[in-house]
Amino acid sequence: MQTRSTRNTKKMVGIAILGAMSFILINFSFPIVPGVSFLKVDFSDMPSIIGMFLYGPVGGIAIAFIRSLLHYVQTGGDAGFPIGDLTSFVASVSYLLPLYWVVRKKGTSLNNLILGSVAGTLTLTAVLSVLNYYVVAPLYMWVLNFDVGPMMQYVLYGVLPFNLAKGFLISVVFIVLFGKLKPWLLRNGLYKLNTAK
């Protein structure tokens, strides 16, 4: 039987490995909305999602933080400011927590995975739309002199459809991946999930 110290060590190692995997994945990104090609999708949230179901929400958040921190160290941020990396971290948390809450409470059936994914996508879209309007876009305009045009149009026709599409793509990959890994996640997760249909 594993001691608490051994379990904690394995948890920290697992989070570190998944954080490194997430950092690798963030470097492979692509645009999806015409006109805002600087907004790009990547699948670096997948290790965070896996980690969340293995180690709980704090584990998933820690993995997202490690990814964003390593990416900031690698790139130096935006003129030295971690605007994009902090935004990426907030986006991950906004998607992860509603997804985890729904699946943990309601169960791991396909319908509940879809429900959790929809909750995560809508939360992600709402949070990032507000954050871009009031904080992120103004910061980019101030730091990089980057003009996005009329703010409301940028959010409505750029940020909002981008995050809806991003949430959809991440959700599809998550549902497929969870279906493949479900027995292993249920067996090895530190937090027991409701397996009811």
Q: Positions of the model-derived regions?
A:
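Loop-helix junctions at membrane interfaces
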Residues: 1-197
